[in-house]
C-alpha cells in the first residue's frame, strides 16, 4: 500500500501521512545521537562521535557547526544534507548582518532553517532534508536559546533536548532528571550531565563523544578529551556507587 503513495513528496497517504517526510525522519532515527542543554549563560552540545579511519582527516568529520559568531548547530541524519543547510544558513546570517547591521536572533535563523525544510515538503522534484537540527545561541541582549527542527519543518524551543538513534531513551532519561536539569546553573554541571547521559544511556566512552560550549560573546570551545576522560571516570564511579547503594537492604 505504501508504495502507491511514496512516489512523490506531495502525495498524502490515506491516513494523512507524507511518507517521504516519514522516511526522512527514519534517516534521523538512524543517525548519531546528539543532545543540547541550555543554562543561564551557556549552550552545551554533546554529540556521538563516529569512528574515523586511520588515514582519514578527523577535522572533516564534524557534527558541530557555527552558523554565526553567536549561533551553533548540530544535527543527526544525512551529513550531505546538513552541509547544504549549514551553507544556506551561514549565508542568511551574513546577509542579515549586511542588511540590518546587527546579528540575527537565534529564533530567526532557526525559523529560516525550518522554512527551508518545509519548502522541500511541498515541491515536486525534491525530497525532504533527512536531518534534525539542534540550534543554540544567544540573542544580542545575551538571552540563550535552544531550538530543534525536524524534517517536516516544525521547530520548538527547549531547555534540553536530543535527536538521533538513542533519542527516545536519552529523552526519557532527561525527563526523569528534569528537576536536576532545570536547576543547572553553570557550564561545568551541564557538561557533566551530558557526559553522564551519553555514558549511562548511549553506552559511549570519552573517545566516542564530542562536547562543545558556547557562551555569550565568546568563541565556541571544544572540551578537551582528557577532561572528558576524567568526567567519564567520575560519572562511572557515581553510577556504580548508586547501583551499590540500591542493592543494599534497607533498614527496617
UniProtKB/Swiss-Prot annotation:
PROSITE patterns: PROTEASOME_ALPHA_1 (PS00388), PROTEASOME_ALPHA_2 (PS51475). It is found in: Cytoplasm; Nucleus. Testis specific. Its main location: cytoplasm. InterPro entries: Ntn_hydrolases_N, Proteasome_alpha, Proteasome_alpha-type, Proteasome_asu_N, Proteasome_sua/b. The 26S proteasome consists of a 20S proteasome core and two 19S regulatory subunits. The 20S proteasome core is composed of 28 subunits that are arranged in four stacked rings, resulting in a barrel-shaped structure. The two end rings are each formed by seven alpha subunits, and the two central rings are each formed by seven beta subunits. The catalytic chamber with the active sites is on the inside of the barrel. This is Proteasome subunit alpha type-7-1B.
Amino acid at each position: 500500500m505504501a508504495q502507491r503513495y511514496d512516489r512523490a513528496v506531495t502525495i498524502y497517504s490515506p491516513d494523512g501521512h507524507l511518507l517521504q517526510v516519514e522516511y526522512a525522519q527514519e534517516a534521523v532515527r538512524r543517525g548519531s545521537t546528539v543532545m543540547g542543554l541550555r543554562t543561564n549563560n551557556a549552550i552545551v552540545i554533546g554529540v556521538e562521535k563516529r569512528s574515523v579511519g586511520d588515514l582519514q582527516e578527523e577535522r572533516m568529520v564534524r557534527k558541530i557547526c557555527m552558523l554565526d559568531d553567536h549561533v551553533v548547530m548540530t544535527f543527526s541524519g544525512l551529513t550531505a544534507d546538513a552541509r547544504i543547510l549549514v551553507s544556506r544558513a551561514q549565508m542568511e546570517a551574513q546577509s542579515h548582518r549586511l542588511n540590518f547591521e546587527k546579528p540575527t536572533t537565534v529564533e530567526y535563523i532557526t525559523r529560516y532553517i525550518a522554512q527551508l525544510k518545509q519548502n522541500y515538503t511541498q515541491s515536486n522534484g525534491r525530497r525532504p532534508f533527512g536531518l534534525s537540527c539542534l540550534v543554540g545561541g544567544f540573542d544580542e541582549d545575551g538571552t540563550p536559546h535552544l531550538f530543534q527542527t525536524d524534517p517536516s519543518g516544525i521547530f520548538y524551543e527547549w531547555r534540553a533536548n536530543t535527536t538521533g538513534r538513542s533519542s527516545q531513551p536519552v529523552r526519557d532519561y532527561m525527563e526523569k532528571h528534569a528537576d536536576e536539569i532545570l536547576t543547572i546553573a553553570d557550564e561545568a554541571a551541564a557538561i557533566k550531565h551530558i557526559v553522564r547521559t551519553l555514558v549511562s544511556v548511549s553506552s559511549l566512552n570519552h573517545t566516542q563523544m564530542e562536547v562543545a560550549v558556547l557562551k555569550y560573546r565568546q568563541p565556541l570551545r571544544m572540551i578537551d578529551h582528557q577532561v572528558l576522560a576524567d568526567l567519564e571516570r567520575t560519572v562511572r564511579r557515581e553510577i556504580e556507587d548508586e547501583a551499590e547503594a540500591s542493592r543494599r537492604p534497607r533498614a527496617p
